[in-house]
A protein has these predicted regions:
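Small-residue-rich hydrophobic segments that form or flank transmembrane alpha-helices
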Residues: 4-73, 133, 137, 147-201, ...
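Membrane-interface helix caps of multi-pass small-molecule transporters
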Residues: 17, 21, 33, 37, ...
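Membrane helix-loop-helix hairpins that form the core translocation module of multi-pass transporters
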Residues: 43-115
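Hydrophobic alpha-helical transmembrane segments in multi-pass integral membrane proteins
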Residues: 44, 85, 89-90, 95, ...
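Interfacial helix-loop-helix linkers and transmembrane-helix boundary segments
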Residues: 60-74, 90-100, 120-124, 189-195, ...
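Cytoplasmic-side transmembrane-helix entry/capping segments in multi-pass membrane proteins
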Residues: 68-79, 100-105, 124-133, 163-170, ...
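Selective transmembrane alpha-helices of multi-pass membrane proteins
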Residues: 79-87, 95-115, 199-212, 220-242
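Hydrophobic, well-structured mid-protein blocks that either form specific transmembrane helices
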Residues: 101-143
């Protein structure tokens, strides 16, 4: 039990730090290990979601004046609808299948962001918003890591890093709130999840403080590539275990 408490605390620090520094990645980071220490995959994604929601809430309180709703609502509405559907499907899927899908997803995400993110530009049209929201909803509902598709959209739509951070965190806050309600309805919000949240919340605040300093002073490009490599290795591990 003591080891689990320490792991949750450290994972929460790392995930919150990544989220605060880059604007996304809480679920990607924490879901590399969380499924192995939680009773079920659904409970792991639920705990990841409420911890990520807390991280986003802290940032939104600080950056709310930079929110532009007309660029946010179309992708957000799409995400909510798709992610809720994915959560209902999740209840009926086998764990080893999810392990395989998660491993493949993490490898693809790591390769994309390491090599292609700077080369691909997207327009902020309604079809793009719906597509990004759909992909984000599928990844969020199944794996608790809805960030990559949404981040690509917001990087292109926002004029500076302050607007980018405000928009991404408002998106993640609202999305995680809706997914948490759907997961609770499906029985994934258990006593174990509540206890895990208590263990992880202190780590969330610590990671947010450190990440805030890094966001102000460093570019973080080297950090991103380290994270992408870690995600890819983790994805390969999931595939081998499955």
């Amino acid at each position: 039990m003591d080891n689990i408490v320490i792991e949750l605390f450290l994972l929460s620090i790392g995930a919150s730090f990544v989220q605060r520094t880059t604007g996304f990645g809480f679920g990607i980071f924490i879901m590399t290990m969380l499924p192995s220490i939680m009773p079920s995959f659904g409970e792991a994604t639920t705990l990841s979601g409420i911890l990520a929601m807390t991280t986003s809430l802290i940032i939104v309180i600080q950056k709310y004046k930079y929110i532009t709703w007309r660029r946010l609502l179309p992708i957000l509405f799409t995400f909510v609808i798709i992610s809720i559907g994915a959560i209902f499907v999740l209840k009926r899927m086998e764990y080893h299948i999810l392990n395989i899908l998660l491993g493949i997803t993490q490898i693809i995400v790591s390769i994309y962001f390491a090599f292609f993110s700077k080369r691909i530009k997207v327009k902020t049209t309604l079809p793009v918003q719906v597509t990004a929201g759909t992909l984000s909803g599928l990844m969020g509902g199944f794996f608790g890591m809805q960030g990559p598709p949404a981040v690509l959209y917001f990087v292109s739509s926002e004029p500076d890093k302050e607007h980018y951070l405000a928009m991404t965190q408002t998106y993640f806050l609202a999305g995680n709130l809706m997914m948490t309600l759907a997961r609770a309805y499906n029985g994934f919000f258990t006593t174990t999840v509540s206890i895990g949240y208590v263990y992880g919340i202190a780590g969330v605040f610590i990671g947010n403080l450190i990440g805030s300093w890094v966001f102000r002073h460093l570019s973080g490009s080297l950090l991103k590539y380290i994270i992408y490599a870690y995600i890819g290795i983790s994805g390969l591990t999931f595939l081998l275990e499955a």
